[in-house]
C-alpha cells in the first residue's frame, strides 16, 4: 500500500469573498515540485472568477483516467514484446446527472491512437484486448463509479490496420 498526496494553495488577497466575487484560481503542487495552475471550470463558475487557462478538477479527472490507462497499456505492450512508438489520446468526459440526480462525470471516453514498430505488430484484436486489460488494471478506473469507455483509433503501425473491429 502507498500514500499519495498533493498540496493546494489558494489566497483571497483583496477579493470580495463574502460577495462571492473571488477568483477560484489556485496552485496544485506535486512531489518533485511540479506546480500546476488550477481553477474551477468556466462551465461551473463564470469567468473572471474561473480561469479558463488553468486546469479544472473535471479536466484533471479525465486526464488522470487517461494517464493511468496509458501507463498500464505501455506496461502490457512491453510485456507482450510489442514496441510502442507513440500513444496519443484526446479523452472526453461528460458531466451529467447520475442515477441519484446529482451532477457527476458520468462517462469518460478514451480514444487512444497507438503506433507500433518492429517485426512483431499486434493485430487490432490484440490492441483491443490490451486496452481492455489496461482498463481492468487501472487504479483510477477501479476507484470511480464513472463509466470509462475505450474506443481505440487504428492507424498505421498495427498488423492489418485496415480491419474494422
Regions found by a protein language model. Name each.
Residues 1-63, 71-165:
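Extended beta-strand/beta-hairpin segments
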